[in-house]
């Protein structure tokens, strides 16, 4: 279980309140698919994923990215119980979708990059450390159901 200090929680919640979920979600998923092209195999029904510009402009990528980042909001609300908050998604990704759990870590790291680009100087090393801790905790929670 990940333990967050009161300061880390406040830091995460403060920044989360400023995140444009639709924009950042689409960017995060898009970057994941571009930088780690083997992840595209889970999205074969998304249409044209042939180039970086096609991926970043793909409406299905943007919509699913928003969905992913919206569910990430559950992590912000449930920092003290990430495993419980992501139990159903862990089961879905393990048993039905068969997603390699390493992809959760990759997506978390991409999210940190997106937040850094969106918030610039406001994304200090302390802010990054808190967010890195959160995305790592989410990746671990999502991988929980894997055998």
Curated annotation (Swiss-Prot):
A GO BP entry: hydrogen peroxide catabolic process
InterPro entries in the record: Globin, Globin-like_sf, Globin/Proto, Hemoglobin_b, Hemoglobin_oxygen_transport
UniProt tissue specificity: Red blood cells.
GO MF annotation terms: haptoglobin binding; heme binding; hemoglobin alpha binding; metal ion binding; organic acid binding; oxygen binding; oxygen carrier activity; peroxidase activity
Keywords carried by this UniProt record: Heme, Iron, Metal-binding, Oxygen transport, Phosphoprotein, Transport
Domain Globin intervals: 3-147
Coiled coil: none
PROSITE patterns cross-referenced by the UniProt entry: GLOBIN
Modification Phosphoserine, positions: 14, 51
Residues binding heme b, per UniProt: 64, 93
GO cellular component, one term: hemoglobin complex
Quaternary context: Heterotetramer of two alpha chains and two epsilon chains in early embryonic hemoglobin Gower-2; two zeta chains and two epsilon chains in early embryonic hemoglobin Gower-1.
Protein family (similarity comment): Belongs to the globin family.
Described purpose of this protein according to its UniProt entry: The epsilon chain is a beta-type chain of early mammalian embryonic hemoglobin.
Protein name: Hemoglobin subunit epsilon
Species of provenance: Daubentonia madagascariensis (Aye-aye)
Classification lineage: Eukaryota, Metazoa, Chordata, Craniata, Vertebrata
The encoding gene: HBE1
